[in-house]
C-alpha cells in the first residue's frame, strides 16, 4: 500500500512547497517499511521456535498414548463384562419380582376363596366370583410370564457364570454370588414353576371355577312353558313374545359364565368347559320339554305308528306340532342365545355353534324320527289332514329353523328338516291319490248298493272328506302340496301347467276323486238287478252329493254348473226313472184308454163292471206290494227329497184314481174303495214320516194292505 502511495506521489506534478511535504511523507513511509521488515523477521524466528516445541509435545503425547492403551482396553473389557452381567441379572431380578407377585396373588386368592365360600346371597356371590376370576387371571398371567422367561433367564445366567469362571474376569465373591443365584433359579424352575401351573392354587382355582360354572349353568332354567294356545295363532305378536320373554339368565350371570369360560379356555381347559356346558344345557333343555309330557314320542317307528289307535295318533300328531314349535322357537332359540353369549369369544366365535348343535341334535332327532315315522306309516285316508297340519307347521317353522341352525355346523339338522318336509309332502299326496284309487277300485266298488237304496258309506265319507279338505284350513296347504309334487315330477312344466293356479290344481285333483266316486257308484248300479232299487239308490246318492256340495266351499271350488250337471241332473233323471218304474205301472192299470175297456164297452154292462173291479183290485194289490216294499226295503233318507217324491207320486196317482172312480163309480157300488183323499194319506204313509223312517235303511214293519182294507 505504501508503495502505491509513493508511486502516486511521484507521478503527481510537484510544487516547491509540496515537495517538502512529499519528502517528509516518503521518509515516514520508509521508516514504516523498515519497522515492518524487522517485525516479520522476528515473527519468523518465533514460528521456528514454536515448531520445535510442537515436535517435542507430539513426541511426549505419542509416548503417553503407548502407555495408556492397555488401560483403555481393560476399561472397555470391564464395561462389556458389566453389560453382559447386567443383561443376565436384570431379567433374573424381574423374574424374582414376578415370583413375589405370584405369591401375593395366591394369598389374595385364598382370601377371596374363603369369602366366596361364606357368601350366601346370589348377587353378591356373583360379584365376588368376578373378583375371584380377576385374581385368577392375574395369577395365570404371572405364572405364564414366569414359564415363558425362566428358561432364557437361567441360560443367560449360566452363560455368564461359565464365562466369568473361565476368564477370571470378576472377583471370587461376585462369581460366587452369581453361581448361587443360578442354583436358586434352577431349583425354583424344577420345583415351583410346574407346581404353580399344575398342582398349586391355580389348578385348585380352575377346578373350583369348573364347579361354579356347572352350578350356575344348572340354575339357568327355562321358565314354565305353560299354555301353548298362543302358539297356534302365530303372527308378529307371537314372534315378539319369543324374542323378549325367553331369555336365559341375567346380565350379571351371563357375564360371570362368559368370564369363567374364557378363563378355562385360556388355561387349557376348553374341552372340560365344553363338556360341562353341553351336558348341563342339554339336561336343562330336555327337562323343560319333558314337562310337556311327550310320552307319544316313544313310539316312532312306522310299524309302531300303524299299531296306534287313530284317536291316540291324532292327539299325538297335534301335540307333536305344538311341542316341536315350543322346542324350536322357545327352548332352542333361548339356548342358542345363551351359548353365543357365554362361549362367543372363544376361538373367534368358532366354538359356540358346535356346542349349540350338540345340545340341539338329540332333541331335534326325537321330533324328526316321530314325523318320519308318521310319514312312512300306512297311507290311510284319515291321516291326510294331520299330515297337512304337520306340513303347515313345518312351513311356519322353516324360517326359524334355517335361522337358528345357520352355518356349517347346523347343515345336518337343516338337511334333515328339509327331508322331513319332503316326506310329509310325499305322504300327503300319496294318501290323497290312493284315496281316489281305493274309492274307484277296491273299497266296496264291486258290492251291490245298500238293500234299501240309501247312500253308501263310502259316498258319505268321501263327500265329507273332500268338503273338509276344501275348507279354508286345508285348501291352501293341500294346493301347496300338489304344486310342490308337480314341480318335483316335471323339471320343465308345460305352459298350461305354468298358468294353472293353485286353486285350479286343487279343483282338478278333487274332480278326479269325485269322478272316481262316480265310477264306484256306477259299478254298484250295474251289479244290482232290482231296477227300482237302482234308481232309488242313484237318486239318493246323487241328491246327497249335490246337497252336500251346494253352497259349500267344495261347491264353490267345483263350480255351480259342474255340480248341477254332474249330480243334480243325475239325481233328477234317476227320480224320474224311479217314478216311472215304481208308480207309473199303477197309472197304467187305471188307464181308461185301455183296449180291454174299449172292447167291453161295446159289449155288456156286466162285463165292464167285472173288468173295472178287476182293475181296481189289481191296482190296490200292486199298491199294497209297492207300499210294503217302500216300508220294508226302500229308503229315501233325505226329508226334502222324500217329501218331493211323495208329492210327485200323489200328483201322479191321485188324479188318475179320482178320475177312474168318478168314471166307473156305478160299477163299484157293491164295495167301498178309499177316497182320493184317503189314497193320498195312504201314499203319504207309504213314504213315511220323519219319525217313522229308519235312516239306517230299516222300515217299520206291517203291511199297507190292512190300511187299505180298513179304508174301504
Curated annotation (Swiss-Prot):
Key words, A-Z? Cell membrane, Coiled coil, Exocytosis, Glycoprotein, Membrane, Protein transport, Signal, Transport
Q: In which tissues is it expressed?
A: Present at low levels in non-mycorrhizal root tips.
Q: Which InterPro entries does the record cross-reference, listed alphabetically?
A: Cullin_repeat-like_dom_sf, Exo70, Exo70_C
One Gene Ontology term of the biological-process aspect is: exocytosis
Which residues, renumbered to this chain, are glycosylated?
Answer: 111
User: Which cellular component, as a GO term, is one annotated location?
Assistant: exocyst
| Chain coiled-coil ranges | 26-53
Q: Which GO terms describe its molecular function?
A: phosphatidylinositol-4,5-bisphosphate binding
Q: Give the source's domain of life in one word.
A: Eukaryota
Signal peptide: which range, if any? 1-18
Q: What induces it?
A: Accumulates in roots, in a RAM1-dependent manner, during colonization by arbuscular mycorrhizal fungi (e.g. Glomus versiforme). Triggered by RAM1. Induced during root nodule symbiosis with rhizobium bacteria (e.g. Sinorhizobium meliloti).
When the coding gene is removed by deletion, what phenotypic consequences does the entry describe?
Abnormal arbuscule development (reduced arbuscule branching and aberrant hyphal branches frequently distorted in shape) during arbuscular mycorrhizal (AM) symbiosis with AM fungi (e.g. Glomus versiforme) characterized by reduced STR and STR2 incorporation into the periarbuscular membrane (PAM). Normal root nodules development during symbiosis with rhizobium bacteria (e.g. Sinorhizobium meliloti).
- Annotated compartments: Cell membrane
Q: Does the keyword Coiled coil apply?
A: yes
Entries under PANTHER family matching the protein = EXOCYST COMPLEX COMPONENT EXO70I, EXOCYST COMPLEX PROTEIN EXO70
Q: What is the role of this chain?
A: Component of an exocyst subcomplex specifically required for periarbuscular membrane (PAM) biogenesis during arbuscular mycorrhizal (AM) symbiosis with AM fungi (e.g. Glomus versiforme), especially critical during the early branching phase of arbuscule development; probably involved in STR and STR2 delivery into the PAM.
Similarity-based family: Belongs to the EXO70 family.
Q: How does it assemble?
A: Subunit of the exocyst complex that mediates vesicle tethering during exocytosis. Interacts with VPY at the periarbuscular membrane (PAM) around the arbuscule hyphal tips.
Q: What is this protein called?
A: Exocyst complex component EXO70I
The organism is Medicago truncatula (Barrel medic)
